[in-house]
């Protein structure tokens, strides 16, 4: 007999209460269970000692706590850490931890590949395979938090020092094109019985899916970042193809609406600096006009070159001059420090070692090698003896 176990990482707080109700348990059991999973990193029901044995026995036959398997783990010379994560069928995504003084930021993925296909992003050149499940999204945070604690010898649980203080959905994929799993994962990040992160410390980055920006403002408004990268529609149409469907004026209006519900009083506009493409003083002046009615700040991102792009990075003097025009116009502007270049973890390089859809057979062979070395993937249908 083949039975599909329920992966409890897929359930938000309300869903976990409902699931426990189906097992004949009261709501407080769901909160206990949630704390064991998300605060203590437990994956063994027998370790959950304050749960009744009868409940633990039920869970062992009906449920699992299964994050995606880690294929590889690399640490950069600057402390940035990147995990390559197996999401099945020859697909992998990447999760990146960026340590800074008094904070630790985790960059997570929401899709295997990306359909938006921005010209300057290597992930989009790999094609789109599928959306990630809730468990595959929140599982990145679950895995990273407790792996970082284990590395440092920090105990699990709320008394242990939290390693991840900020989460950014800026990895592989467009979060708003995988809406329901993304929002469920966000709710878990914010819940006090799970990770308890402030809405101000969780940022969702989008290329500009206007209707879903409006929906997010009602369902789970977190800090918003927008991948802008151009100062006019003609330029953005070529860099971010989604702009043809949701042009800049519609996007700016959506950003203004979002701020009525957002935890921060500004939108962050991300702008990849491309030599001779979008980096002139005139482009900067156009930006000042474009965003004049949107409270915002700019984050200028030095481009990370890859062979298929045909693009090059703006030099440092040009980036600084561009930033100065924006600052002279009254905009808070930062220049992102590149991190993790030596392990291909920098922004735009999250293409994965096995995610090239143009070489399916090679990819599947490579994944089979990883499976043989690191063990069978988690999160699959499990055979239970009848």
From Swiss-Prot:
E.C. no: 2.1.1.192
Entry's localization field: Cytoplasm
Claim: rRNA-binding is one of the keywords in the record: no
Cofactor binding annotation: Binds 1 [4Fe-4S] cluster. The cluster is coordinated with 3 cysteines and an exchangeable S-adenosyl-L-methionine.
GO BP annotations, alphabetical order: rRNA base methylation; tRNA methylation
Disulfide bond residue pairs: 107-347
Superkingdom, natural source: Bacteria
Location, primary (coarse class): cytoplasm
Record domain Radical SAM core: where: 100-341
Record's catalysed reaction(s): adenosine(2503) in 23S rRNA + 2 reduced [2Fe-2S]-[ferredoxin] + 2 S-adenosyl-L-methionine = 2-methyladenosine(2503) in 23S rRNA + 5'-deoxyadenosine + L-methionine + 2 oxidized [2Fe-2S]-[ferredoxin] + S-adenosyl-L-homocysteine; adenosine(37) in tRNA + 2 reduced [2Fe-2S]-[ferredoxin] + 2 S-adenosyl-L-methionine = 2-methyladenosine(37) in tRNA + 5'-deoxyadenosine + L-methionine + 2 oxidized [2Fe-2S]-[ferredoxin] + S-adenosyl-L-homocysteine
Active-site residues from the entry: 94 (proton acceptor), 347 (s-methylcysteine intermediate)
Gene Ontology cellular component annotations, sorted alphabetically: cytoplasm
Residues annotated to bind [4Fe-4S] cluster: 114, 118, 121
Pfam families found in the cross-reference section: Radical_SAM, RlmN_N
Gene Ontology MF terms in the entry: 4 iron, 4 sulfur cluster binding; metal ion binding; rRNA (adenine(2503)-C2-)-methyltransferase activity; rRNA binding; tRNA (adenine(37)-C2)-methyltransferase activity; tRNA binding
Cofactors: [4Fe-4S] cluster
Keywords: 4Fe-4S, Cytoplasm, Disulfide bond, Iron, Iron-sulfur, Metal-binding, Methyltransferase, rRNA processing, S-adenosyl-L-methionine, Transferase, tRNA processing
Residues reported to bind S-adenosyl-L-methionine: 173-174, 205, 227-229, 304
Record has Nucleotide-binding as a keyword: no
Function: Specifically methylates position 2 of adenine 2503 in 23S rRNA and position 2 of adenine 37 in tRNAs. m2A2503 modification seems to play a crucial role in the proofreading step occurring at the peptidyl transferase center and thus would serve to optimize ribosomal fidelity.
Sequence similarity: Belongs to the radical SAM superfamily. RlmN family.
HAMAP family documented for this protein: RNA_methyltr_RlmN
NCBIfam families per record: rRNA_mod_RlmN
Other facts: Reaction proceeds by a ping-pong mechanism involving intermediate methylation of a conserved cysteine residue.
Name this protein carries in UniProt: Dual-specificity RNA methyltransferase RlmN
Organism the protein comes from: Herminiimonas arsenicoxydans
């Amino acid at each position: 007999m083949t039975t599909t176990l329920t992966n409890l990482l897929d359930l938000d707080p309300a869903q976990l209460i409902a699931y426990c109700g189906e097992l004949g348990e009261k709501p407080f059991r769901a909160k206990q269970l949630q704390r064991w999973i998300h605060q203590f990193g437990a994956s063994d029901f027998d370790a959950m000692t304050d749960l009744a044995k009868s409940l633990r026995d039920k869970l062992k036959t009906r449920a699992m706590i299964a994050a995606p398997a880690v294929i590889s783990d690399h640490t950069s010379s600057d402390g940035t850490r990147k995990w390559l994560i197996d999401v099945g069928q020859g697909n992998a995504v990447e999760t990146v931890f960026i340590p800074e003084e008094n904070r630790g930021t985790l960059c997570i993925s929401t899709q295997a590949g990306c359909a938006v296909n921005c010209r300057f992003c290597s992930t989009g050149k790999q094609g789109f395979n599928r959306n990630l499940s809730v468990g595959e999204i929140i599982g990145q945070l679950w895995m990273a938090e407790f792996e970082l604690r284990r590395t440092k010898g920090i105990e699990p649980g709320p008394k242990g020092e939290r390693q991840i203080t900020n989460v950014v959905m800026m990895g592989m994929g467009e979060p708003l094109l995988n809406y329901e799993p993304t929002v469920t994962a966000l709710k878990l990040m914010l819940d006090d019985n799970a990770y308890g992160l402030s809405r101000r410390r969780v940022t969702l980055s989008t290329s500009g899916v206007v209707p879903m920006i409006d929906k997010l403002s009602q369902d789970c408004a977190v800090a918003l970042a927008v991948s802008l990268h151009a100062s006019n529609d003609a330029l953005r149409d070529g860099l971010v193809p989604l702009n043809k469907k949701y042009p800049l004026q519609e996007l700016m209006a959506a950003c203004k609406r979002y701020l009525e519900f957002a935890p921060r009083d500004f939108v962050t506009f991300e702008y990849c600096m491309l030599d001779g493409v979008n980096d002139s003083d005139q482009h900067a002046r156009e930006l000042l006009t474009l965003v004049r009615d949107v409270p915002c700040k700019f984050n200028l991102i030095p481009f990370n070159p890859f062979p298929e792009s045909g693009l090059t990075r703006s030099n440092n003097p040009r980036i600084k001059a561009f930033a100065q025009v924006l600052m002279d116009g009254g905009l808070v502007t930062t220049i992102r420090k590149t991190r993790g270049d030596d392990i291909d973890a920098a922004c735009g390089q999250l293409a994965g070692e096995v995610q090239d859809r143009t070489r399916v057979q090679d990819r599947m062979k490579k994944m089979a090698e990883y499976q043989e070395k690191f063990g069978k993937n988690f999160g699959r249908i499990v055979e239970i003896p009848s």
